[in-house]
Amino acid sequence: MRKVILKLIRFYQKYISPLKPPTCRFEPTCSTYTYQAVERFGILKGLLLGFWRVLRCNPISKGGHDPVPTEFYLFKKSNNSLRRR
């Protein structure tokens, strides 16, 4: 099943994405990010990460470099838990 999902993403990248103007605000692109996430974490977690990434890719987002995490989590971990007062 993982191979089917990865082939669908590649199909999108090869045949559908070139028909649209580039709008992704992130590097790697959202489709590449999702592909890498599915490879790294499997179908469920990979697609969840990809879906969350697409939701974050919008006009009010700064965008920038956002690689697939090495550990699975949907929300970025904060270092504010040990704030000094």
Swiss-Prot record:
Keywords: Cell inner membrane, Cell membrane, Membrane
Cell division in keyword set: no
Chain ranges passing through the membrane: none
Topological relation to the membrane, as annotated: Peripheral membrane protein
Family classification: Belongs to the UPF0161 family.
Function: Could be involved in insertion of integral membrane proteins into the membrane.
HAMAP family named among the record's database cross-references: UPF0161_YidD
Protein name: Putative membrane protein insertion efficiency factor
